[in-house]
Amino acid sequence: MVLSQRQRDELNRAIADYLRSNGYEEAYSVFKKEAELDMNEELDKKYAGLLEKKWTSVIRLQKKVMELESKLNEAKEEFTSGGPLGQKRDPKEWIPRPPEKYALSGHRSPVTRVIFHPVFSVMVSASEDATIKVWDYETGDFERTLKGHTDSVQDISFDHSGKLLASCSADMTIKLWDFQGFECIRTMHGHDHNVSSVAIMPNGDHIVSASRDKTIKMWEVQTGYCVKTFTGHREWVRMVRPNQDGTLIASCSNDQTVRVWVVATKECKAELREHEHVVECISWAPESSYSSISEATGSETKKSGKPGPFLLSGSRDKTIKMWDVSTGMCLMTLVGHDNWVRGVLFHSGGKFILSCADDKTLRVWDYKNKRCMKTLNAHEHFVTSLDFHKTAPYVVTGFVDQTVKVWECR
């Protein structure tokens, strides 16, 4: 940088003042002579302490610049990742923000599953302590405990009205609870091993369950009878989930596959095999996301003119995969977690994917650009489960350290 003659003269006089006032007489004399300075009292007063002032000002400005750069980078990140720009951002783009709103304690063993009630402002957690707990997610208050299972409760599911809750357990049973009276109204026996997953079908008439006995069973809600058994997996079936209209169910297993079954015929419609380890979790894409998925992946539209259905899977191979069920093709693989992926689901707005893992993080993915856009260091221990509220701006996570956390989205 080139200084003007005036700036150079001011700098030289400030240096001369600094040398003289700090006792560097010899250096002052030499510098004054070489810089050809004509010093007098008036000028001396003007430049007294000027060099020190300039120096401290530069340091102060540097600090300010660094702070502003940091804020600018944060603002850029918020802008690109759907952050809070006043209240103008579309709620469909709201994502969880740290810190958590509540950290809820009460379970005496690791939390295995967390879900929101479809109607009321409550959420439910299941645990290895054999209990199910009900919490108010708006106030953080504990409401009640449902007891009945004799071993770890592995999964829970509401019907669409929220009047019935299904649970399954390592005690090899499935229980149906009246969520208005909080009583167990039915217990179903039939699996020969740990029942790892349960889901109430969209019509509310049937329940599906998956087990370590390698089977998937369908049960009648009214009678508790097992009406269908789906066989094909070669190892422990980890999770089962029905699609939106209940015509298909998806399952994932220790055999490293994801299978899609036609409910009416029990036929295995697709066997999806690209994971390299146990597949822990699956989630169907909501129909609201079909067009953006098709656009992001370039997947072909079927003869019917409708894209999809699409499915997500998370695995111990640390990846998340998106599948086109109609073709059996893996559309994308999301890489970023550093440990087993334990939960995955679509954001209710359809544009993002949320996941949790044993790397202690909760992540938000922009699948259109195939990148992780937000990482929340959720806890000091493994994150076992997550759920995203369909209408309210909340995410809930469960942890191995026995706690449940509620996150606000904005």
Curated annotation (Swiss-Prot):
Subunit structure: Can self-associate. Component of the cytosolic PAF-AH (I) heterotetrameric enzyme, which is composed of PAFAH1B1 (beta), PAFAH1B2 (alpha2) and PAFAH1B3 (alpha1) subunits. The catalytic activity of the enzyme resides in the alpha1 (PAFAH1B3) and alpha2 (PAFAH1B2) subunits, whereas the beta subunit (PAFAH1B1) has regulatory activity. Trimer formation is not essential for the catalytic activity.
Annotated InterPro entries: Dynein_regulator_LIS1, G-protein_beta_WD-40_rep, LIS1_N, LisH, PAC1-like_LisH-like_dom, WD40/YVTN_repeat-like_dom_sf, WD40_repeat_CS, WD40_repeat_dom_sf
Region (Interaction with NDEL1): 1-102, 388-410
Subcellular location: Cytoplasm, Cytoskeleton; Cytoplasm, Cytoskeleton, Microtubule organizing center, Centrosome; Cytoplasm, Cytoskeleton, Spindle; Nucleus membrane
Domain LisH: 7-39
Comment block on domains: Dimerization mediated by the LisH domain may be required to activate dynein.
Annotated protein name in UniProt: Platelet-activating factor acetylhydrolase IB subunit alpha
Taxonomic source organism: Pan troglodytes (Chimpanzee)
Family indicated by similarity: Belongs to the WD repeat LIS1/nudF family.
Pfam short name (any one): LisH_PAC1
The organism's taxonomic lineage, starting at the top: Eukaryota, Metazoa, Chordata, Craniata, Vertebrata
Biological process terms in GO annotation: brain morphogenesis; cell division; establishment of mitotic spindle orientation; germ cell development; lipid catabolic process; microtubule organizing center organization; microtubule sliding; nuclear migration
Keywords associated with the record: Acetylation, Cell cycle, Cell division, Coiled coil, Cytoplasm, Cytoskeleton, Developmental protein, Differentiation, Lipid degradation, Lipid metabolism, Membrane, Microtubule, Mitosis, Neurogenesis, Nucleus, Phosphoprotein, Repeat, Transport, WD repeat
Domain of life per record: Eukaryota
